[in-house]
Amino acid sequence: MKRNVLLLDRISAVLYGEPSDRVWLFVHGKCGCKEEGAAFGEIVCPKGAQVLAIDLPEHGARKEESGFVPWQVVPELRGVMAYLRGRWGRISLRSNSIGAWFSLLALADMPPEQALLVSPVLDMEQLIRNRMGLALVDETQLEREGESAADFGETLSWRYLQSVRAHPITKWNAATEILYAGRDTLTDRDTADAFARRFGCGLTVMERGEHWFHKPEQLAVLNAWEEKHTGPEKSATAMKNSRCASRPSPGGRPGSSSMGAATARESSSEEGSI
C-alpha cells in the first residue's frame, strides 16, 4: 500500500493509497496516532479510496505539543477538511472515541459524505460530570480551582467543561454508522441510542465489546463492520435508504443490530479513555 508522509501546516499526516477521487479522513482517539489509519487503509484502499490520517496535539509526532482540547483541535480539523475539499471530490470520515467527538464538533457545517464512528464519545458533558463524581469534585470547587487532578489519571478542567456546554452537538448531516460496545464505560447505551435516533445513524452493537476494540473477537467484529460499510457502492443516499428500510418502530433501538465474531485483524482503535 502506497504511503506518503505529509505536513499540513504544523499537522503531521500520512496519506495511504493510490491517487483517487475519494478519501477518508482518519481521526484517532486518546493515546492513538496517525499510523493507526494503516489498518483501515488496508480495507478501503483496495476499493479505490485513499486514507489521510493525522496526528492530533500531544500524540504521535506531536507528542511534545500541548493542546489536546476542543478550542485547538476543532479549528485544526476544519483546516484539514478545507484542505481535503480542495483536492478530493468525495470525502468521508473514520474516527475513534474522543476523535469522533472532536470531528462532530468541527465538521457540523462542512460534513463528510459518510462517517464511520467507533466507540464515539457522544455526550462529553455527561462524561465529565461522571468523572467529577468519581473524583468527589463539585462545580463550585472546580470553578474555584480551575483544574483538579483526579486519582484515576485525568485532569478535570473548568474551562473544558464550560467549552463543552457552550458548544453542544446540535447538527450532523452525514450518513453515519456507529460501532458501539455493550461494555463501553464512557458512553452509555441510552446516549448512543438517542444520538442515533436524533441524527438518523445506523447503530451496530457488539454486546461483549469494550470501548477499546482490542481482543481477537472484537477486532473481528470491527473488521467485518468496516468491510460492510465501505466501498464505492456505499453512497450517502444508499446508506440512508438502507437504514430507513431497516429502522424499527418508535420505541425500539434506532437502526441497531448486534454482531458476533468474524475474522480478526489488527485494530486501529485506541486505549479505553478520553
Task: Show where each model-derived region lies.
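The alpha/beta-hydrolase serine catalytic core
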Residues: 110-194, 198-205, 209-234
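N-terminal cap/lid segment of alpha/beta-hydrolase-fold proteins
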Residues: 1-17
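Catalytic nucleophile-loop/oxyanion-hole region of alpha/beta-hydrolase
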Residues: 59-85
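Gly/Ala-rich beta-loop-alpha elbow adjacent to hydrolase catalytic centers
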Residues: 95-103
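The conserved beta1-alpha1 loop
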Residues: 25-29, 180
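Short beta-strand immediately N-terminal to the catalytic nucleophile in serine-hydrolase-like folds
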Residues: 93-95, 118
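The serine-hydrolase catalytic nucleophile loop
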Residues: 30-42, 190
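Conserved alpha/beta-hydrolase
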Residues: 44-63
